[in-house]
Amino acid sequence: MPPFLITLFLFHSCCLRANGHLREGMTLLKTEFALHLYQSVAACRNETNFVISPAGVSLPLEILQFGAEGSTGQQLADALGYTVHDKRVKDFLHAVYATLPTSSQGTEMELACSLFVQVGTPLSPCFVEHVSWWANSSLEPADLSEPNSTAIQTSEGASRETAGGGPSEGPGGWPWEQVSAAFAQLVLVSTMSFQGTWRKRFSSTDTQILPFTCAYGLVLQVPMMHQTTEVNYGQFQDTAGHQVGVLELPYLGSAVSLFLVLPRDKDTPLSHIEPHLTASTIHLWTTSLRRARMDVFLPRFRIQNQFNLKSILNSWGVTDLFDPLKANLKGISGQDGFYVSEAIHKAKIEVLEEGTKASGATALLLLKRSRIPIFKADRPFIYFLREPNTGITVFFDRIQIIYQCLSSNKGSFVHYPLKNKHSF
């Protein structure tokens, strides 16, 4: 039986920006990839919540490009929209990744990759050079026949600490525990993490229990954060005539922002908005916002889910990679036989603020007296985490329902402990 390649993408969250035509072109391509991934997941998830990290999915695919040849490499390039074999693209992405890790004024962002190699497996010197140069990567020997390898467990340890339970979290266990590694020769683990404090923090004393109308019309009482603040806001119309409000919530000491997209018509489902999202639309929204003083209401939420990326990539035309007879990954070791067995993406995201104590009476009085415009995410909405300097989308997610069991207090910050393992 030929050896196969297992790739894990271990996650948390992140983002980036640059200059000139190359920057603009790559920003659009990265955004198109993010939207393609989002729309593919949305199409099969119907009216449920989900969280994905486009940046975390694209990074390991880029590394695989260094070892892919022939139609295998072409299919990866078609899926990503670019190839790292283009020197301009390679240099641009390297410069972008070189800005990470970063830590300043309460914001922490880190991107890294580890390539665990079965002891005795020969690797192409050229592939080793590329991987070592790419996105803070490293090569480490490991016994991949043992899923509980010390090296891999160490790499996963930090993200496991924030694992939690809940109705929206999906199946338990991590992909590495669910995939046979008996014939694995390589394991690629990419980790991306983001933790940021709001530039203008939500006060726990302003958190209220307010109604949230779910996708199917069910109304739930949920903890709703609130603040009156200066924000970037805009109202737009998509190509089908649907109107949306777009709000930007920035993080302290960082260019990273959370963008929320809320249909103006309460009867417009997200499924009517999603097919009309394009990279140009996202660019217009994020660059055309204007300062406004608003009452902002945002629910606390937590999502964890797992996807089979293999089926999604197959639907995009990436098929050779998973076929032991067709996969051409000779650039990895110069040998035939490597192929990707599985591609599993697992992610978790939490948006929390300190305290759960409601202050409904005060809020009602505030709203009755205030003429300040209101942005109230009390129904299904789309949101994405983005670093405007490079336009890279770290998360692209959807909220359709807020579960009532969210009672944990973890301070007045937004935490994205993304545990994504894509097991190839």
Swiss-Prot record:
Any one GO cellular component localisation term in the record: extracellular space
Question: In this record, what's one Pfam family?
Answer: Serpin
| Keywords, comma-separated and alphabetical | Glycoprotein, Protease inhibitor, Secreted, Serine protease inhibitor, Signal
UniProt key word Cell division: no
- Report the GO molecular function annotations: serine-type endopeptidase inhibitor activity
Source domain of life: Eukaryota
Q: Biased-composition ranges for Gly residues?
A: 163-173
The cross-references to InterPro entries, in alphabetical order and at most eight, read:
Serpin_CS (IPR023795), Serpin_dom (IPR023796), Serpin_E3 (IPR031172), Serpin_fam (IPR000215), Serpin_sf (IPR036186), Serpin_sf_1 (IPR042178), Serpin_sf_2 (IPR042185)
Where is it localised?
Answer: Secreted
- Positions with biased composition (Polar residues): 146-157
Oxidoreductase is among the record's keywords: no
Q: Please give the SUPFAM superfamilies that the UniProt record associates with this protein.
A: Serpins
Q: What does this protein do?
A: Probable serine protease inhibitor.
Q: Which PANTHER family match?
A: SERINE PROTEASE INHIBITOR, SERPIN (PTHR11461), SERPIN E3 (PTHR11461:SF129)
Family membership noted in the UniProt record: Belongs to the serpin family.
Protein name as catalogued = Serpin E3
**Native organism:** Homo sapiens (Human)
